[in-house]
Amino acid sequence: MLKITEAEKKALKGRGLILNNDGEHFIARIVAPNGVFTNEQMQMVTDVAKKYGDGRVALTVRLTIEIQGVPYENLEPLVKEVEAAGLVTGGTGSIVRPVVACKGTVCVHGLFDTQAFAKRIYDEFFVGWHEVTLPHKFKIAVGGCPNNCVKPGLNDFGVYGQSVPEQDLNRCRNCVKCAVIERCPVHCVSRGAAGKIVVDKAACTNCGKCIAACPLHSFSEKERGYAVVIGGIWGKTQRLGTNIGGVYSEDEVMKLIEKAILLYRELGRTGERFGRTIDRVGVEEFIRQLKSDEVLSRKGDILKMAATAKGGVITVNAQISSS
């Protein structure tokens, strides 16, 4: 049995080097900026798996790769080769976790380049805020459309693409076979009393399929952006993320992520998931604070917070990378 202290185990786990249940070997978790690895990086993965592990690799839910069966003495040389390939080990702890994205970049349903946006979030918050300790893990997911393949609503902060349609009834000719009715995947389009097309806006998911369907262009795109859901939890207990309402640009989403993290650090109790913090504060009140810029005026103080009697964070003087 490997003889290392609990403090050493914790420190290694914080670097994505996790002791197995055999008490002897580790897995090494390798993180890509957006879940996408180049062929050169994949070759490196297979090489280090053979050289330093037992030759096996496993894929995780958050699109990271884990090298299996790594002896303790092989951990440091493995990490050096991973870093030389432009990747890092990690993805554990009470920090921003690896960012996941669906394949919206290449998917026929994708409304955005999700992998590029995930890379932007990764650089800013996984890398830049890596030393900012939070009450618990903080997971971010980027979805390209309302299909929600990457499950944004089960992440602490999730976004998914929106193409908001606008209807021009003057262009509608009451076609016997309406392409929009046939194309709508959620069946929120029907004929009204006068034969005109009626959209149930409450049921519409803003997938944008109707916009290209009508040959008379009776539907156009009014707005394109991201819906935002916060506080999703999937684990021992579950909580579906709360939609904060509205459609946001990438820049606006980046600012919302920053404010969400700051509010979580300020209001969360140690060991409390983000969704539980939201519920304790009150959903409406939390969303009000999130949409306001008030928390940004307290940013410096929040990043200096230590643990408090009510809970709070556990790191003093958190630093944000300028890189």
Which functions belong to the PLM regions below?
Residues 1-25, 35:
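Intrinsically disordered, low-complexity polar/charged tails and linkers
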Residues 2-4, 26-177, 202-203, 316-323:
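Small-residue-enriched alpha-helical segments and adjacent helix-cap loops
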Residues 47-54, 87, 126-130, 186-190, ...:
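Generic secondary-structure signature for well-ordered alpha-helical cores
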Residues 54-61, 92-93, 131-137, 266-280, ...:
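Flexible, glycine/charged-enriched surface loops at secondary-structure junctions
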Residues 139-146, 275-286:
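A glycine-rich phosphate-binding loop feature that marks nucleotide/adenosyl-phosphate handling sites
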Residues 177-199, 209-225:
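Iron-sulfur cluster-binding cysteine motifs and their immediate structural context
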Residues 234-269:
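A hydrophobic, small-residue-rich beta->alpha segment in the mid-to-C-terminal subdomain
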Residues 287-323:
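C-terminal, charged low-complexity interaction regions
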